[in-house]
Amino acid sequence: MKIAYLGPRGSFCSVVAEAAFKSEELYSYATILDVIEAYNEGECDFALVPIENSTEGTVNMSIDKIFHDSNAKVVAEFVLPISQNLLAVSKEQKIEHIYSHPQALAQTRVYLRKFYPQAQVEITESTSAAAEFVKNNPDLPAAAVANSFAAKMYDLEFIAENIQDLAGNSTRFWLLGKEKQSFDLNQTKDKVTLALTLPDNLPGALHKAISVFAWRDIDMTKIESRPLRTRLGQYFFIIDLENNATNSLKIPYALEELAGLGVNVRLLGNYSVYSLGEV
């Protein structure tokens, strides 16, 4: 099997890919859009992308690409505790530029503002791309925000460790494919993710849509809106549901009721969630 992931090697996504697929072919891509498009074009069997961080929220690029431009299903979810570090070619390195992915920079903004207020923040496609750039440009007064795996891979020094602003920082990753997958990892729960598009002519449409789960005691763990890209004020809603033994019997009836209300329902995935160790 071929698995596409957001690289290069050393990214948090690559850590998840290597933990889940120990003997499969792993292919890194430069951007989230490239990863999902590789799946769309049949270049790989699965695509692995970040979907949400506990500090900074949803990775909009991932969810928008999946909803608007892909028929892929979510076939597994991985939760990875995230530890961010400031890395450079040496501990004596002068730091005038700090490179990393936008999510990593956002997760460490308090530290960076306190200790490097004059440094220019530079955006890269992934944390490992930042580490690779710093390694390949040793004469630049630069550092990267990345994980310890990237530090080892690119032989960088730790300027500071665990610089994330909040404890308990973690990221969810979605594995995209055709059918639900199982792994020899720590499985924590099962979930269903739906994308709902509400009818224009239904007063209280969102309330009525949510109610089909509430009165059945189906636990909804997340709801979030994203633009439909049609006109201003038009949205689709991403909903996560706990899919335990009881809920699995109730959810089909809830979906039938939604259809009766004129709500367009797309099943994004029915999958298991796995917890990984910190990197």
Swiss-Prot record:
Q: Give, as in the UniProt entry, the pathway in which the protein acts.
A: Amino-acid biosynthesis; L-phenylalanine biosynthesis; phenylpyruvate from prephenate: step 1/1
Q: Does the keyword Lyase apply?
A: yes
Domain ACT, by residue range, is 194-272
User: Might you name a Gene Ontology BP term for this protein?
Assistant: L-phenylalanine biosynthetic process
GO: which molecular function terms? prephenate dehydratase activity
Q: Which reaction does it catalyse?
A: prephenate + H(+) = 3-phenylpyruvate + CO2 + H2O
Identify the keywords attached in UniProt to this record, alphabetized.
Answer: Amino-acid biosynthesis, Aromatic amino acid biosynthesis, Lyase, Phenylalanine biosynthesis
E.C. no: 4.2.1.51
Family annotation (Gene3D superfamilies): 3.30.70.260, Periplasmic binding protein-like II
Q: Where is the Prephenate dehydratase domain?
A: 2-178
- List the GO terms this entry assigns under cellular component, sorted alphabetically: cytoplasm
Q: Which InterPro entries match?
A: ACT-like_dom_sf, ACT_dom, Preph_deHydtase, Preph_deHydtase_CS
Q: Which SUPFAM superfamilies match?
A: ACT-like, Periplasmic binding protein-like II
Q: What class of enzyme is it?
A: lyase
Q: Which Pfam families match?
A: PDT
**Which chain positions carry the site (Essential for activity)?**
T171
The answer to whether UniProt assigns keyword Amino-acid biosynthesis to this entry is: yes
Q: What is this protein called?
A: Prephenate dehydratase
Give the organism the record lists: Lactococcus lactis subsp. cremoris (strain MG1363)
Quote the gene name from the UniProt entry.
Answer: pheA
